[in-house]
From Swiss-Prot:
The keyword Hydrolase does not apply. Its EC number is 7.1.1.2. One of its GO terms (molecular function) is NADH dehydrogenase (ubiquinone) activity. Belongs to the complex I subunit 6 family. Its main location: mitochondrion. GO terms for cellular component: mitochondrial membrane. It comes from the Eukaryota. Core subunit of the mitochondrial membrane respiratory chain NADH dehydrogenase (Complex I) that is believed to belong to the minimal assembly required for catalysis. Complex I functions in the transfer of electrons from NADH to the respiratory chain. The immediate electron acceptor for the enzyme is believed to be ubiquinone. It comes from Heterololigo bleekeri. This is NADH-ubiquinone oxidoreductase chain 6.
Amino acid sequence: MSLLFMISVGFSLSSLSMMVIQPLSLGLMLMLMVLCVSGLTSLIIFSWYGYLLFLVYVGGMLVMFMYVISLIPNLIFLSNKVFAYFFFIFFGFMMMNFFVMKELVSVEVKSMSLFDYGYMSMGGSGIIMLYDNFFCYVLLAVILLFVLISVVKICYYCEGPLRVFKFK
């Protein structure tokens, strides 16, 4: 049922993103869609893959929308019409999923085999979390720290690519 809910939210957000025109609103819609897609990925494939996908998307979106937002003035963020449209589309997808899946899911068919290790989100990839792979995690942390220091050095207050904000 949570998979149907996530799919409904994803389709609702993707249809809602066509109505929004301001960069802040588009950034919010894109972040919510990324959260939905990474949640779906972690439910279907592996939880660590969804988490990694979320981090990559968020990192790219933060840099891109910082440039866009610094150049465009802030306008009206979201209107009530957009929220009404979102809830209408969301409930439409939820009802459609409910009526389509009602015949496929029955209470008698549920068994305890769903709680086996093979059906969990990690699926058999628990070997990634072993002590032997600790060096890979340390190397990844050092690389991410180096990238963080590089980005901070590039975007220093007076030397960065962003425009300088002068407060009065």
